[in-house]
């Protein structure tokens, strides 16, 4: 079953089928108590005073009922009140902190992305995400080192649930079924939880559900996912100016230029499916990979190690996307189109995700852009529930987000460009993205990167229309120049011809007499 998940992604198996919180989220550790779980109330105090709930004494926020999207959804998930991610997060909590102004976080103790200061009123200079190949040696090592540290550092604020909501308090009803998790493994767990199957019983998964792919939320969900990791890494380093780099995978090549020991690890000579022992990533264990086992046991990924990271870039002639693919994708004016799913045509989102051809036409058996890059790298990354285990996931999605940001800046879409209803479950504009907590909607991330505190040092190709207009202008210029040259040549020919005719005329107009020299006149 797990091996078929990627085929489900690419459409080959159609039968299956703004208040920004603090760091990553399943649920804050402070809220995973028996009392909080039973009351469904996650409104922690800010600081030592228990009365300072949500920072209310400083005017930072207050505790209130969670707002959820009530609009109908479409798509293959037709069940109701079966999955604990429906109307997220009401199965777990129905009250949380609502933060005022630029305050944010599960207890309103932080600032929104892009803001700083004691009252969160100062705009931070945006951090700049750079091409990973343009980083200095120091910047590169800093990034790789902090990733490695995040793999082994327990997340300071959040824990993961190891059981579904009905079993969250354990057999006795007194023991929360939770586990600590490292910062990076938490990043992996969030992605897994957003794509995991709905369970109808032991070994009876309903696979036609995905909260982070195959719909409009693909771009906003992964954007927020990266922002959370970026902030966690900044805090781990003590460097608020740190920014995630990106990997420009639109090279058109059949080689992986980040699969080197200087970056994410070359193939291991004696087993090309594993990472070279010269790379720090050769030691990385994956988590959340055993989807079939979780389904059979009716449980969730608990963050346990499940084997070494694998990667085997394809050598069968398959090529990565090209810059022309990016250009064509950026030429799509419409953000998304009905049915807002993997079979949407002439949709920027679907072209970027990779179910459409870059020019917008639907071509289900084919992979493009984001999907093609995943498929090309092969190994652990091919399965969506486990894909984030490979650190290349971070830089691949950073580039995908850069394309999304470029599109936002070029077209300035209105809010209603995003469907309010009848997108697949989790993908309506005001749906709370699963499994982030406190709740954050798709709409809150549907803005330019600069508004969220970061930018990209990137020069993406112009749109197809711009290219065609440029080609037309160049063509008309060249055409005009050729016409002018032809006229000039014609004038020169006429001038030369005239000169030649004048050359055969007598220099003096002389009349000759028929009389001989000696005769009298």
From Swiss-Prot:
GO biological process: developmental pigmentation; melanin biosynthetic process from tyrosine; positive regulation of neuroblast proliferation; ventricular zone neuroblast division
Entry keyword set: Glycoprotein, Isomerase, Melanin biosynthesis, Membrane, Metal-binding, Signal, Transmembrane, Transmembrane helix, Zinc
Cofactor: Zn(2+)
Catalytic activity: L-dopachrome = 5,6-dihydroxyindole-2-carboxylate
Note on how the cofactor is bound: Binds 2 Zn(2+) ions per subunit.
An annotated Gene Ontology molecular function: metal ion binding
Leader sequence residues: 1-25
Family the entry assigns: Belongs to the tyrosinase family.
Protein function: Plays a role in melanin biosynthesis. Catalyzes the conversion of L-dopachrome into 5,6-dihydroxyindole-2-carboxylic acid (DHICA).
Name of the featured protein: L-dopachrome tautomerase
Source organism (scientific name): Gallus gallus (Chicken)
Gene expressing this chain: DCT
